[in-house]
Structures are given as C-alpha cells and as structure tokens.
Amino acid sequence: MRQRMISEVLKERYGTKVYRLALSSGATCPNRDGTCALPDGTRLFGGCTFCSEGGSGEFAAPYVPVPEQIENARRRVDPKIPARIPEKDRRYIAYFQSFTNTYGPAERFREMFEEAIAHPQVVALSVGTRPDCLPEETVDMLRSLKERYGKEVWVELGLQTVSDETAVRIHRGYALPVFEDAYRRLTDAGLTVIVHVILYLPGENREDMLTTIRYLAGLAPPLHGVKLQLLNILRGTAMAAEYEEAPFYLPTLDEYADLLRECLDLLPAETVVHRLTGDGPKKLLIAPLWAADKKRVINRLRYL
C-alpha cells in the first residue's frame, strides 16, 4: 500500500494517537424529508437506502449541547487510551458524522462547530455532509473557523459511486456535477475534502467500482482523503428489505481485500486513507457476517 493511513499521519503530526469523538448536530437529510427528488420527480423520504435510522452514525449520541457531548464522548473513548498518556496530552477529532451536518442555515451550525473546534484538546473538526448542502455561506463559515482557530477542518462528502444508475437506486438524490461543484469550492477555500465510497453496492460489478476509483484518482486538485467502505446490510434499512427479497452478491473477505488492493493501486500515493472497511453495529448487521469480526478483518487488510 503506497498511501498512508490517517492514524499514521495524525500521530506523526501531533506526536500521539488522535481519537475521534462522535458528535451530533441534530440535523437530518434532504432525501429524508422530501426535499430531494429522483430524476423522474419522485420525492425522496427515508434517506439513502443503505442508511439506518442513525444516519450512518450509530456511535454518535443524540443531540445535546456540544460541550456536554464532548465530555460524554471522552468518557467513552478515554478508557481506550493508554493510562501513561496524561489527560491533558490527549488529542481528539470532533466528528459530526450522522446525517447531513450542513443541512440548514450556516449560522445554525456555526455555534456548534465553534464550540467543538475551540476545545483545547481538539485538533481537527470533521463534518460529514452532502455536496448539495454546501451553499457559499456554509463554505465561508467553515473556512473562517479554520482560519480563526488555526486547526484542520475536514469536510467528508458522501459520494458512494459515480454511477448515475446506482445513485438513483440507492436514493442518493443528487447528480455528479453537484459533487464536482462542491469539491471545487471546498478545495478553493483551503478545506480538506474526504470522499466516502461504498463498495459492492447492488447492481455494481468490479469495473463499475473501479470506475468510481479512477474518477477519484483524476480529481483536480488531487484528492486529500478517501474512505473505502464495504457495503453493510443493516437491519431496518430499505436496502435490507431489498436484499431479503432478492439477495445480491456480497464478497468474501479475500475477494474484498483483492478489490481494495486494486483500488489503492489506482489512487494517488498522496491520498490519505481514512477507512478500508465498514464499522456498523453488530446487532444490526445482516450481511456480510464476516464484517462483524473486526479483528480478523483488520488483520487481513493490514498488509495491502
């Protein structure tokens, strides 16, 4: 693997392992409330078909004031940190993951994000969102936070695939040019962009998935970070109902590792890898069941 993992990059940059604090902004998504539509005009409700009721943020707490969320998240994370690291020397990423964390007026999010990034032990603000929910005032707000606090601001965009057909099938709710416009404006603003891709979406073959990766490899400016996630079929999702009615192919661990190797060969060496698999809750996982054995998966993917 020519690329570096984000954990390695952060440890080198900050001199210690950096831990994510899963936070909630209390937002929803435009394809959950009928704002988005398919090309035929059908209004979308319920979100992307693979997404659970937790908005793909099962480890985030329900919305409460951000300072309280940070302390609650630290209580969950700190037991994993070696006791030899003093509490004052611990470093964190404030990660707003669930749903679309820029869906609404920029000022609604400014206070929350500022409370997070201003925390003395937070080294980066990470915001999960959609490219169709990034008006210029929101991009300016994120840029101003980066400049004011001198800390990293990451924007994670859920692209999933470049296939128009798959995008309709999973109810993504926006077209590829929308992503391209958001990517350009975010990078022009000096913000760090991480793109989230899901592998083995229904109807996609190997070449379809590699087409998405080649697209990312050709982005200009070059892509800073990528999350490659195996599709997890989670209980209670629209995709779970689709899978149970007509199961589609999901890979073995070895097949998945082989595809990842090819994906990484295509991506630029300077692209930082933030994820190589999924991390859904075991209690909701329907398939593939091997994905629940996190230790086995990590060991298999360690030497890609």
Feature locations, PLM:
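Alpha-helix N-cap and loop-to-helix initiation/capping positions
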Residues: 65, 104, 108, 170-178, ...
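Auxiliary Fe-S-binding modules of radical SAM enzymes
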Residues: 2-8, 12-21, 225, 232-304
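Conserved C-terminal portion of the radical SAM core fold
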Residues: 177-238, 254-279
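N-terminal [4Fe-4S]-dependent radical SAM core
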Residues: 1-93
